[in-house]
Amino acid sequence: MATDGASCEPDFSRAPEDAAGATAEAAKKEFDVDTLSKSELRMLLSVMEGELEARDLVIEALRARRKEVFIQERYGRFNLNDPFLALQRDYEAGAGDKEKKPVCTNPLSILEAVMAHCRKMQERMSTQLAAAESRQKKLEMEKLQLQAVEQEHQKLAARLEEERGKNKHVVLMLVKECKQLSGKVIEEAQKLEEVMAKLEEEKTKTSALEEELSAEKRRSTEMEAQMEKQLSEFDTEREQLRAKLHREEAHTTDLKEEIDKMKKMIEQLKRGNDSKPSLSLPRKTKDRRVVSISVGTEGPVTRSVACQTDLVIESTDHVKKLPLTVPVKPSAGSPLVPANTKGNVCTGAALGRPGIDRQASHGDLIGSSPPTVPPPSANRIEENGPSAGSASSTPPLPNSTAPPTVQTPGIAPQSYSQAPPVHSLHSPCANASLHPGLNPRIQAARFRFQGNANDPDQNGNTTQSPPSRDVSPTSRDNLVAKQLARNTVTQALSRFTSPQAGAPPRPGTAPTGDGGTCPPVGRTSLKTPGVARVDRGNPPPIPPKKPGLSQTPSPPHPQLKVIMDSSRASNAGAKVDNKTMASPPSSLPQGNRVINEENLPKSSSPQLPPKPSIDLTVAPAGCAVSALATSQVGAWPAETPGLNQPACSESSLVIPTTIAFCSSINTVSASSCRTGASDSLLVTASGWSPSLTPLLMSGGPAPLAGRPTLLQQAATQGNVTLLSMLLNEEGLDINYSCEDGHSALYSAAKNGHTDCVRLLLNAGAQVNAADTNGFTPLCAAAAQGHFKCVELLISYDANINHAADEGQTPLYLACKNGSKECIQLLLEAGTDRSVKTRDGWTPVHAAVDTGNVDSLKLLMYHRAPACRNSLHEEESESVVFDLDQGEESPEGTSKPVVPAELINHADREGWTAAHIAASKGFKNCLEILCMHGGLEPERKDKCHRTAHDVATDDCKHLLENLNALKIPLRISVGEIEPGSYGSDDFECENTICALNIRKQTSWDDFSKAVSQALTNHFQAISSDGWWSLEDVTFNNTTDSSIGLGTSSVRSIMLGNVPWSAGQSFTQSPWDFMKKNKAERVTVLLSGPQEGCLSSVTYASMIPLQMLQNYLRLVEQYHNVIFHGPEGSLQDYIAHQLALCMKHRQMAAGFTCEIVRAEVDAGFSKEQLIDLFINSACLIPVKQSPVNKKIIIILENLEKSSLSELLGDFLAPLENRSTESPWTFQKGNGTSECYYFHENCFLMGTIAKACLQGSDLLVQQHFRWVQLRWDGEPMQGLLQRFLRRKVVNKFRGQVPSPCDPVCKTVDWVLAVWRQLNSCLARLGTPEALLGPKYFLSCPVVPGHAQATVKWMAKLWNAIIAPRVQEAILSRASVKRQPGLGLATAKKHPSQGQQAVVKAALSILLNKAVLHGCPLPRAELDQHAADFRGGSFPLSIVSSYHSYSKKKGESGAWRKVSTSPRKKSGRFSPPSWNKPGLSEEGIRIKAVSQQNCNRNASLSKQKSLENDLSLTLNLDQRLSLGSDDEADLVKELQSMCSSRSESDISKIADSRDDLRRFDGSRNNPAFSTVNPRMPVSPKEVSPLSSHETTECSNSQSKIELGVSRVKSFLPVPRSKVTQCSQNTKRSSSSSNTRQIEINNNTKEEIWNFHQNEQVEKPNQ
């Protein structure tokens, strides 16, 4: 059993294994685990778990059994119960054969095999289990995902249901719409079919219209050609009609000439019959308007009050009641005639006054000066009115704003009416009742203050005082004398303190030294012998010649503003009680105060105690002050910085008076203005500074007993008389200081009284005495700008570096005041410029703070005293050069002398001078500071701000450009061939501006700057006026009026590197320019080489549009002729158009050739044929057309006959085809046909304004381009060209219109236009000039003489010969038809020579010299260089003109033949003044008042004789030749042109009379009429007796008799300015007169043929 059991054991163990393996294999074969369902998987899992449990049991059993077998084998414990084990043991222990196999398998091996198999199976099962678990997990995950997906599915299902419902609704709507659209589609399809049908119809119609349009175009071109032909025919007819019209006009002028001759004969006959009755009435009329004159023999009874030039407003009725010399009683209400109302009868009646136009005579004071005349109802005598007729002319003072001057009676003109004593208007009986009771003291005072009649004044002029009435004392009644004196004092006081009744002062009138030095409202320095001072004791009389009393001048008064009510003006002639008017200082301008005191009645006259005259006291009523205290009241100058001559001038005349109260307070200084206004009468009378008189502030009486106080007062007032008397006293402390520390020297220096300062310094006053604030007299004078006082104090060793308590030095105070003279004096004295105040300010700070450029220049540039005179000009020029040129330190300019430490010095707040200038916007000062090389613009103040941070916009721009590169921008037009076709004066390059390139500038900014600069330049040169590039607001158009713009640019060169607008480099523009050392930016314009005309436009200044139009005409018509006056650039235009066409054709692939031929008088038709044939322009008919383009230019066609030269080619040129051949006859008798092909272009140039004669037949076969001088492009070409030249000369800057260069260019333009206009009016179109000759005008800044010299050369070389040739050729047409023009030109007649010279003289003065910018003296030097200027212009200017305005008297003026004048007394003439006469000559004169019957009669007779003589001359000339008469008419019509300037409207003063060289020895004049010598006497105003003598001598001379010419000028009237049978009416200032006398023996011809002579009917 054991054996069986043993043997069966393996089978048993093997069976399950095999079964399991078979099952596994079957399972693998039959099914797949992955395909099992869930239930099958569960079942499989349970089976596998059961199998695992069974295996575990088997394993345990086998382990137990193995243990038993092991024990048996090991320890011999055998179990005999098992026979199989025994058999096995026997078998194994048997034979001992090792190779015997056991009978049965070892259980251990079986167990191991089973165990190994089990392990494998376990691993496999564990693997399958892990896979099953992972699948289970995945399954769980999938379950969760499935649940989420199901939820989502449910949601989506719900949504889909909703969407479905919505879509269903939409679908229903879409279905409806589809149905509707389907219906519409059907309708649209039907419509489309209809439209397509219509479109086909329209296409057919369009094609038909296109055919018709092409046919219409062909017809239009044909019609245009016909129109061109018709226009040419019209031009021809117009020329023919114009010639006919000229003939008719010539006939008409002949008839008019006959009519005028008849009229003149009738007028002469009438004048011969009516001469006697016609002379009496004007005499009465004239006398009615004349104010009586005072001859030298008249007595002093004619009364003149206060001044000699009072305004007299009087009607004819008033004056008619007065005889010639009227003794007027002293009544205050009657109208009075001033003592010096003599008008032009006086020898020197014109007082030199800058800026006043003819206000030297009384004509404009009496009825001819509306701005200065009160209403006629105010018949009054102006107390301190404007002086208009002082006797001696004095040099005018620079103060152009001072009030009018007043002339004193003591300086009346010599040998004429002597001035009567002046009395108060408020004392009618003063003159009649004063002589009883005069004591010797009064007589002595009278003798002293009246002065000697022949004492020379300070200017050396001896003045005559009138013969005073002998007021010898007849009674010694002192009581009566005292009472009369008191009354007189009171009334004089009330008079001088009453409101002034005077006309408003004329602006620009300056006070003069003598003959009118008394200021209008400052004081009345009048000699009043009839008003005596009251005897207050027995001191000795003042000797008349005491030193220091009358020989010391007092300063003139600056302008004062009189505060008065206009309603009181009419009461100025009578006694008027006016209330006190004390204006506070705040209501008046600085330095002007006027206080009109109250007039006190006679009952309040003070009882003056007898005291010495020098002991001044004021009574309680305050009515009288001693004459010594008030004899001289100095003027305190207005504190105006930069005055050329402040009030410390020494040019004023001193005329001490007995009682001279100041009618208004003198201008006070700023310090006195601050203290308040004083109402004291003493202040009103003397002008005493209120700051020195605190007791007078209340208006009550102030004792003045103290001598030091009197010294202060005299020094403050500038009272030299009182001051000298006080200084002569012993024991007087001249260094006494008042409470504020002001010494007398300080007060005198502060108020600018140079004479007082000199007296005090000579007396030993301390020159460096300081006041409480530490200011010395030098500080006070420098602070007020009194440079005379400063110079005097410096000469007395004043401390120039003295610093006040706050550290202000005199230099600092002068800079603060802006006084250039004081600064210069201090700098020359060697003052220290670096002294600082307590606030840290230097003089540079002070100068910059006031914005005074001149002061800053002096501080920075003033070096040595040697350059004192020329310093300012050099500095200003150098500074301007620096700024304009943009260079930091150009060679030759002065360098600043101040160190950089002073310029960069900072004050207490850290501000430098640059901070101050930048913050206040003082750009000029900042520029001067920036020119200093050591300026630190980045320096910061204590708030860390630079000058740029606090600067205004302008100053910021200046500071930003401080370190910028200034690169000139130039425009280049390429190479211009030298001498090519009139382009000699064209420039290749022109500088248009300077580009400021800063470090932060980008390429976009640079591109915009270049474009803007080009646009501005093109706009500027094509504008009408001188406008700055910055000031002009140009429109947004890219092209200018000449058609140029940024599109005209071909390329731009940055140095030598090409660049295009918008291009950017890696470097910035600033770095690029620095690295490449680019010194300029050049803009190249497109030219003919590119097929463009932009460069031609810029070179010639012809608008681009017109050049393109010319090019179109050439390409369209093939035959074009350019014609115009000589010098109209015809050749240049033709050549440039040919070049442009050539390059265009070459760009299109054609070959092109330009053939140029110059036509002269010998150019024959055969030569032209050879030219046409050789250039292949004229080809045989048999030959086919060539593709080569030929451009033929025929120049100077005016030198040949067009009809002879081109007559046979007209038809072939117009119709270029084989159908219009031209037959050429060869020399051998054969002929050949040629024709012009379409590729040939013919251009011609003619230097002639218009065609004449047979040449008109050629006109209709060519396209003519007329270049008129008065139309574009020639009209504005010269202006644009010269403006571009000026811009180039000024390095791109446009100068201001007032710059001399602009005036010179404008003058050249005016010369060209006026010259052509006059030549056109003269009927000589062949003499017209184009602008070419004027293109070479030199533009030299500051040297207008070069331009005038160039003009003289042009006139002599070109203009004058052309004019002479044209006039001679015209005169020769009628006179010498058989001899020809050449003979007439070689041998002109005397009449022709005279006409030529007259024409040249008129053209020279009318068109050339008129408006010349040179000063008068320089123009006189250059005038002789002009040929033809020696003809006397009075010949053509001695004819009359008519005016609508009547009412002028015969005024006496002199006429100069000069074209221009610059006189100090008269304003320059206006040639085109709108209010002047349209016809003839209108002479401006001042009406004459002081002439009597005899004078007027003599004038009329001499006038008639002169005019009859000119008429005879006129007839003699006209009888000689009719052709010359025509030219004469042209000359006179040219003179009387409305549109042109008038030759007679030239300078009208004797000093400005022009005398041309060669006028004395002129054969043309001496041979025509040798019987007329002209007196070489100078024309001068005549007195009455001289006029009478002249009239008596002249009345004996008959008409036409040879006699000596009268030296009286011919008076002219606006009504008839011809033979001077004039209508006499009221005077006017709008007339001028003809100068007859030229100081040469010349003949006076009257060229005016058609004058109408009127006889006087009044």
From Swiss-Prot:
GO terms for cellular component: cell cortex; dendritic spine; FAR/SIN/STRIPAK complex; glutamatergic synapse. CDD domains: bZIP. The keyword Metal-binding does not apply. Its main location: cytoplasm. Disulfide bonds: none annotated. Keywords: ANK repeat, Cell projection, Coiled coil, Cytoplasm, Methylation, Phosphoprotein, Repeat, Synapse. Residues 399-418, 580-590, 1559-1569, 1581-1595 have a biased composition (Polar residues). Residues 1539-1558 have a biased composition (Basic and acidic residues). Residues 120-276 form a coiled coil. Pfam families: AAA_lid_NAV1, Ank, Ank_2, CortBP2. The keyword Coiled coil applies. ANK repeats lie at residues 706-736, 740-769, 773-802, 806-835, 839-868, 909-939. It comes from the Eukaryota. Interacts with CTTN/cortactin SH3 domain. Interacts with STRN, STRN4/zinedin and MOB4/phocein; this interactions mediate the association with the STRIPAK core complex and may regulate dendritic spine distribution of the STRIPAK complex in hippocampal neurons. Activation of glutamate receptors weakens the interaction with STRN and STRN4. This is Cortactin-binding protein 2.
